[in-house]
């Protein structure tokens, strides 16, 4: 069997657990049948066949019921049954699942009744299931893991799910296929954003001069059309990517999926999963002009050559997530998820190399690269990257890191209920403490959501910024309207009071409830605890959009954008970027930082936290 990635079948299931699209690949299935016969030639076992769509739907429904949700528990719990994914006791089973094709649990140890490994990816309202080609022996090893009595992988154990999956190269390809289909279904096929300054000819000198005096040059995003293969170098824009509605706003386009399969993986082996490349090839075909030299192999991610003005653009885009508690017993948590986006408008098939600086100061926790990249050497603080760039915008590298410069927004949020329908709150925040030019915060907003209470009155004046109230939220706009913060910090406070509409109390069936309420009032020493307890009886169920708001108040969410550099201290020195064969191509670099789930938990309320063991 080949060591690469081949897909036996894939299914797309909607939120009603119905298969709405499926595709089986007979060429790959023939390989599986041949390998199965070779492995079991002396056992006399019948050859297992791929299940029907109805069998997949029924098996997926049974798994959800048995595992508690679409993804499952991920670890062995009291509800786990022998042979189930959670029985294996590995969190990866939330993403690589198995399906039992029969209703009897006793058949779980028969490999013919189990479909594994299935890469599960959820996007929009759909679940994408991709079944890659694996060795029958690997399937038998997984069945053994499902039936063992001990819990979790033992230290030094040869047979564990992690070691098994590491030896299956098709797992990565299956997830790439699943993510590609998820992006097409949801319409999320827009290429990564690459930002370039308006005056690229001036370059880094202008940026350094303006940054030192607190002036940040404006930047604009580069559009992401795929370069045309015709000699004129005209660019095209993929209508599929730009006109596609977002998740939940359109039906499943089966014709688009069939056309994508016919081009990207016609016989089950992924060739090129870039929808923009495929759209460009269909629009332009392949150009016979300026073919690459015979000694150069044209990679799959660059189906034709670029022709036109040359330049190389890099953008570091980081997302900062934080949980700020302002409590001695719970430490604050800040993490950075970053990626390096690239756009290489270079003729021919050049190699690009550069040293990535800042690895030690960025405290990198995880890192991954685009298939076009090679990492031949690395050091304590430098890592050399060599890549042959594809067309259009692409993500060269993704990483998880610590926030080397510290939290961009520090502070606390307090809200105390003085009665059932009235509360007093206080914000105190410090923006960009320890941050220097060229880092510049373009806007900062703090929102207090109250999805289960309706605001009827509000009073409060912040020391900086403006306030906007809606029926279920209070928004404090600290920075905005063209005002940015660069080269200095800002401390701001916001005290105030807020009043909600009265809760609709439930009718008491008899006097027992009233007596129990009086008893609870006597047992509760803290008046505020009693108010919260009393309010929770009458609060409606929490909305799925706000799963953390289980009380009348819990947290405030911070939104911001920072430009000029990364907060993890990851950087690219444009002078160290080398292009071979050598060309006079300008190299530009930019960075922007946005907020993710940046939460200020109410210091006086309840807050979830993970215990450090």
From Swiss-Prot:
The keyword Membrane applies. Residues 511-521 have a biased composition (Acidic residues). One of its GO terms (biological process) is vesicle-mediated transport. The gene is AP5M. Its main location: membrane. Belongs to the adaptor complexes medium subunit family. The keyword Kinase does not apply. One of its GO terms (cellular component) is clathrin adaptor complex. Residues 309-563 form the MHD domain. Pfam families: Adap_comp_sub. This is AP-5 complex subunit mu. Probably part of the adaptor protein complex 5 (AP-5). Keywords: Cytoplasmic vesicle, Membrane, Protein transport, Transport. InterPro entries: AP2_Mu_C_sf (IPR036168), AP5M1 (IPR039591), Clathrin_mu_CS (IPR018240), MHD (IPR028565). SUPFAM superfamilies: Second domain of Mu2 adaptin subunit (ap50) of ap2 adaptor. It is a peripheral membrane protein. PROSITE patterns: CLAT_ADAPTOR_M_2, MHD. It is found in: Cytoplasmic vesicle membrane. It comes from the Eukaryota. Residues 501-522 are annotated as: Disordered.
